[in-house]
């Protein structure tokens, strides 16, 4: 998820936090009962030896990565087992699980962040499970995965029935099934099956009853204008933009139940913040008119500030002014906020939106004030100085992305300061830290948790190297920097040099074992 979809990220976090246990695969809290695993005949037990073969031998495999001590895992367990039992006769589907306290590396490889994590493997390819955590939903979701990506419709009755079954359906009308554009549509359907249900009509005469010319695509939906025909070029970019942009209402509410629909919107996404206890009739009417005029250029949604008061501040607004509006542009990797001191009216907002789309508005960067003095061995970056201190620096730069409330970050602080002190006289290396909770960082930098530590090499700032080693000694970082830096440097003392070599020797011996 793009970092600048900040609202969506927070909504996703709040939606998921109730269904996952915090923890790390390295920490087994020890109150699980592993013996019972072997009594479950319908749930496959996976480990490093059989994992890859198991997820590849079935058309669809659902894997639960869990920890025995996790309360949410214990709650899910009987529902999961019942789903496995109900699906046991279907040899194309498998339900399995991995105990992350026993198979740490396997869980790390699958990027497990909390428990339980559910992943669907379809023909060996991994996708997050996005259904409800109930027996019924698990069964339905996996059975749905087996259905063809594209249905073939042969009559008006077929089309009407298809529309009734699916709130959003996309139908391609073709003369034949060997046209290159038919192949393009089929591939697009396979890659966007979660956005809508796809079908085709392969009949020139029948197609002409629904479209002016073939091939063409029509989107049917249960809201706003029910039938929308594609009018752009018949290529992937245009079709995806058409489908994503028309799969949501002209001005719909975004909340825990709907945020997924907005996740992959390809055009700028405008968030209107309102107070649901007030009369918003005129505001909604005005913004709906703006949304209509900008159709294809932007997608609009509204957020109830009463339900999600922290969302506006996460976008960089004060959270105290309603109505307010913010635009998130994935393409520009930028966020734009309407000045809360300005009068909120149809004219002012309409012009501002037009200027945002036209590239006339400067993006908002969440940033703390730049430190008056930044002479300490560990440099402090903020949102407005990150580019200067890190990306534009000619040095190899080690950066700690932290949050002030993070306990692990607090434990690391004296060690990181010691690292800065130790390397302060090495001209080619800079040690930097940034409060990533209070400052924006470039959206292509993936921060999965705090602290995240990365080395931005002097000759390759676009591909930082993540530090995955121990954090209990500053010399661990020294060794990491020396091994990966673009510019060679000498350590401050031969004694420490010996220490690093000793660690290398120890590591080599460990690898041999």
Curated annotation (Swiss-Prot):
Show the InterPro entries listed in the entry.
PDI_thioredoxin-like_dom, Prot_disulphide_isomerase, Thioredoxin-like_sf, Thioredoxin_CS, Thioredoxin_domain
GO biological process annotation, one example: sexual reproduction
Please list the residue ranges that the record marks as compositionally biased, kind Basic and acidic residues. Answer: 500-513
Q: What are the recorded GO MF terms, alphabetically?
A: protein disulfide isomerase activity
Record's catalysed reaction(s): Catalyzes the rearrangement of -S-S- bonds in proteins
Q: Single GO cellular component annotation? A: phagocytic vesicle
Q: Which UniProt keywords apply?
A: Disulfide bond, Endoplasmic reticulum, Isomerase, Redox-active center, Repeat, Signal
Q: What is its subcellular localisation?
A: Endoplasmic reticulum lumen
Q: Which domain of life is it from?
A: Eukaryota
What are the disulfide bonds? 70-73, 406-409
- Matching CDD domains: PDI_a_family, PDI_a_PDI_a'_C, PDI_b'_family, PDI_b_family
Report the function annotation for this chain.
Participates in the folding of proteins containing disulfide bonds, may be involved in glycosylation, prolyl hydroxylation and triglyceride transfer.
Q: Which NCBIfam families match?
A: ER_PDI_fam, pdi_dom
Q: What's the protein here called?
A: Protein disulfide-isomerase 2
Identify the taxonomic lineage of the organism of origin.
Eukaryota, Amoebozoa, Evosea, Eumycetozoa, Dictyostelia
Give the gene name: pdi2
């Amino acid at each position: 998820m793009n970092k600048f979809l900040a609202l969506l990220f927070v909504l996703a976090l709040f939606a998921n936090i109730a269904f996952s246990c915090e923890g790390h695969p390295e920490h087994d809290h020890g109150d699980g009962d592993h013996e019972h695993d072997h009594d479950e005949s319908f749930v496959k037990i996976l480990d490093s030896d059989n994992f890859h073969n198991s997820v590849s031998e079935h058309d669809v495999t659902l894997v639960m990565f869990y920890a025995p001590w996790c309360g949410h895992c214990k709650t899910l367990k009987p529902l999961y087992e019942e789903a496995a039992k109900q699906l046991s006769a279907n040899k194309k589907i498998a339900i399995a699980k991995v105990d992350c306290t026993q198979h740490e590396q396997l869980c790390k490889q699958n990027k497990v962040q909390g428990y339980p994590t559910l992943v669907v493997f379809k023909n060996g390819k991994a996708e997050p499970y996005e259904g409800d955590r109930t027996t019924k939903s698990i069964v339905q979701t996996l059975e749905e995965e087996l259905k063809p990506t594209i249905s073939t419709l042969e009559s008006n009755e077929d089309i009407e029935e298809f529309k009734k079954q699916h709130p959003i359906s996309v139908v391609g009308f073709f003369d034949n099934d060997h046209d290159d554009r038919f192949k393009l549509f089929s591939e697009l359907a396979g890659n966007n099956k979660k956005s809508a249900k796809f079908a085709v009509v392969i009949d020139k005469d029948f197609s002409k009853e629904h479209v002016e010319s073939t091939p063409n695509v029509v989107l049917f939906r249960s809201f706003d204008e029910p039938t929308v025909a594609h009018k752009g070029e018949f290529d992937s970019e245009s079709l995806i933009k058409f489908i994503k942009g028309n799969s949501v209402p002209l001005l719909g509410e975004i909340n825990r139940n709907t945020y997924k629909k907005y996740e992959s919107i390809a055009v700028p996404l405008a968030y209107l913040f309102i107070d649901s206890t007030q009369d918003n009739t005129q505001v909604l009417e005005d913004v709906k008119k703006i949304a209509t005029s900008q159709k294809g250029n932007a997608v609009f949604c509204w957020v109830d500030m009463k339900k999600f008061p922290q969302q506006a501040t996460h976008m960089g607004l004060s959270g105290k002014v309603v109505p307010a509006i913010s635009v998130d542009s994935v393409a520009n990797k930028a966020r734009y906020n309407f000045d809360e001191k300005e009068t909120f009216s149809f004219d002012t907002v309409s012009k501002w939106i037009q200027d945002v789309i036209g590239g006339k508005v400067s993006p908002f960067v969440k940033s703390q004030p730049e430190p008056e003095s930044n002479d300490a061995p560990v440099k402090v970056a903020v949102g407005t100085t990150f580019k200067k201190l890190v990306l534009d620096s000619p040095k190899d730069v080690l950066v700690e992305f932290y949050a002030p409330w993070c306990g692990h970050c607090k434990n690391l602080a004296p060690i990181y300061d010691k690292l800065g002190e130790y390397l302060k006289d090495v001209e080619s290396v800079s040690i930097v830290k940034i409060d990533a909770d209070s400052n924006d960082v470039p959206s292509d930098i993936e921060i999965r948790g705090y602290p995240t530590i990365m080395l931005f090499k002097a000759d390759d700032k676009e591909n930082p190297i993540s530090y995955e080693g121990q954090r209990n000694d500053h010399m661990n970082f020294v060794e990491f920097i020396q091994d990966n830096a673009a510019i060679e440097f000498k350590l401050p003392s031969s004694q420490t040099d010996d220490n690093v070599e000793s660690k290398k020797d120890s590591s080599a011996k460990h690898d041999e074992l």
